[in-house]
């Protein structure tokens, strides 16, 4: 028997248009290969949200042993686009839902990843309520990292002063 792996919407549209013939590629594929081809076809749809897309890439990588480079080549996207999509999956589930629902953009999601994990849910909630832009989140993250670096430098100076005092004693 034959099974449509990719192009079911085109096939349905051709039936609605009463076409008697539809161009097709007939090939043998085991269940695993059929699933891979169907997933790749679905990832090329324009109506996927960024989280669905990221989950699709993750499936290609984990289930089919592809690299990001392999996956990007199969779906016609750049490796960096695949990598950026996958980064979103590191967000907490409730924040990922906000991105999936469109309350936050993918840019917001990636910007939030620069903050400590325990701060991300509250920052996401604030961003939704206050309409914080991606650029504002990026500036906040940069300021936080600058303060962390300053704190680290102060600790290093204190440690060196302490060691100098110990050597003098």
Residue ranges and their predicted role:
Residues 1-47, 98:
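A short, basic-hydrophobic beta/loop patch
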Residues 48-169:
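Amphipathic alpha-helical extensions and coiled-coil-like segments
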């Amino acid at each position: 028997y034959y099974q449509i792996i990719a192009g079911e919407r085109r096939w349905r549209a051709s039936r609605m248009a009463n076409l008697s013939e539809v161009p097709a590629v007939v090939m043998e594929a085991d269940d695993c290969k059929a699933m891979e081809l169907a997933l790749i076809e679905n990832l090329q749809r324009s109506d996927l949200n960024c989280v669905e897309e990221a989950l699709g890439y993750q499936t290609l990588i984990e289930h089919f042993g592809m690299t990001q480079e392999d996956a990007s080549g199969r779906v016609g996207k750049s490796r960096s686009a695949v990598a950026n999509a996958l980064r979103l999956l590191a967000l907490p589930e409730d924040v990922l839902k906000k991105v999936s629902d469109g309350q936050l953009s993918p840019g917001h999601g990636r910007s939030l990843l620069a903050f400590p994990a325990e701060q991300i849910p509250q920052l996401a909630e604030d961003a939704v309520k206050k309409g914080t832009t991606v650029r504002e989140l990026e500036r906040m993250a940069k300021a936080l990292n600058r303060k962390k670096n300053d704190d680290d430098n102060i600790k290093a100076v204190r440690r060196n002063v302490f060691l100098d005092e110990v050597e003098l004693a």
